[in-house]
Design a protein with these regions (language model features):
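A structural signal for alpha-helical segments
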Residues: 2, 6, 28-39, 83-86, ...
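A structural signal for well-ordered alpha-helices, especially hydrophobic packing surfaces
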Residues: 4, 15-22, 48, 52-55, ...
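Acidic/histidine-rich alpha-helical segments that form the ligand environment
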Residues: 14, 72-123
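Helix-loop segments that flank and shape redox-cofactor active sites
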Residues: 14-39, 101-114
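Leucine-rich amphipathic alpha-helices with coiled-coil/heptad-repeat character
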Residues: 25, 51, 55-58, 62, ...
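Conserved alpha-helical segments that form or flank metal/cofactor-binding pockets of metalloenzymes
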Residues: 31-67
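Short acidic DE-rich linear segments
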Residues: 142-152
Length: 152
């Protein structure tokens, strides 16, 4: 399996995992978090479709579910109830991993496809490093505070 096919296999695993997280979310802001997880699996599904169709047009083989599970067996999440933090924490790491695989796949595709991979990489990094981090409040920086002396 080349880097492009491996990336597609990872997207299949990520899609199935996010679908499971969507179904098994519990606690907190359930309604809005459930809705956001749904948006993520729809987004990954659209990307997966585009990536596979593009790969087929380049002569690459679509990895089967079996291929994907064999390649990424340690990434398959069991279906079980999960809180918001665990669910979105997984997505944060999965998006970052997917962005790295998109970058690696650029080496085996023509320039126009490289551009598409970079667009998806940008979107995943934006979601992970800005939106999800803020959602989790994990590493969002706080604004610096300044003491002003009004007597000057």
């Amino acid at each position: 399996m080349n880097e492009y096919e491996k990336m597609c296999a990872y997207f299949k695993i990520m899609y199935a995992n996010i679908f499971s997280l969507h179904h098994n979310l519990i606690g907190g802001n359930w309604h809005s978090d459930h809705k956001q997880l749904g948006k993520y699996y729809e987004m990954i599904g659209i990307y997966l479709d585009e990536l596979i169709e593009c790969g087929l047009s380049l002569g690459y083989k679509e990895p089967s579910i079996s291929d994907a599970v064999l390649t990424f067996s340690n990434e398959v999440l069991p279906c079980m109830n999960r809180e918001k933090g665990e669910s979105f924490g997984y997505i944060l790491e999965a998006f970052r991993s997917a962005a790295g695989m998109l970058k690696a796949a650029e080496a085996v595709v023509p320039p126009d496809v490289q551009n598409k991979l970079q667009e998806i990489e940008y979107e995943l990094n934006l979601e992970a490093d800005y939106k999800i981090v803020r959602l989790l409040n994990a590493t969002a920086p706080t604004a610096p505070t300044y003491d002003y002396d009004d007597d000057d």
